[in-house]
């Protein structure tokens, strides 16, 4: 069962130890995934992807970052999207609610997901944007282009946008950088502290 966690192991963010791939969900669901951050979050658990897709379907557009290189994970994601009726409500190149997108640093996984789940938008994560990566997205109908924030300037935004790609960023460190990102014309950003961002001030 796919779970939602950043690392390949549970060591850093739970009271357990071991690789995710070697554990079943019953074992994973017993772990304390909050106390490392603050004792008041001791009841926090690692959620399954199914739980997230079910709970947040009508609340937000869900962006799934695929970290594993297993084909089975993409196939399972498609099954879950069908189960929760995401596919019938999805349009390409949009952040519809309900809706879901798939992103990854792994080019082969983006291509595989695009093949298995062609109905939804896909995006490529990267550190350094290059012409080759722009071409990769254009040639494979990958609509999202997501470099590390500090590698983005106005020329890149114009170049990518003029070619029909949607550009966003990851790696922002503070609210001031969120303001900078939207002034640059980015379509979205990834942060670890969404509660600090006033969305209305960015519109």
Protein language model regions, located:
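Short acidic, Gly/Ser-rich segments with clustered Asp/Glu that frequently serve as metal-coordination loops
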Residues: 1-3
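Metal-dependent phosphodiesterase/phospholipase catalytic core, i.e.
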Residues: 6-116, 124, 163
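Alpha-to-beta junction loops
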Residues: 21, 118, 185-188
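C-terminal active-site rim and adjoining tail of enzyme catalytic domains
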Residues: 41, 123-203
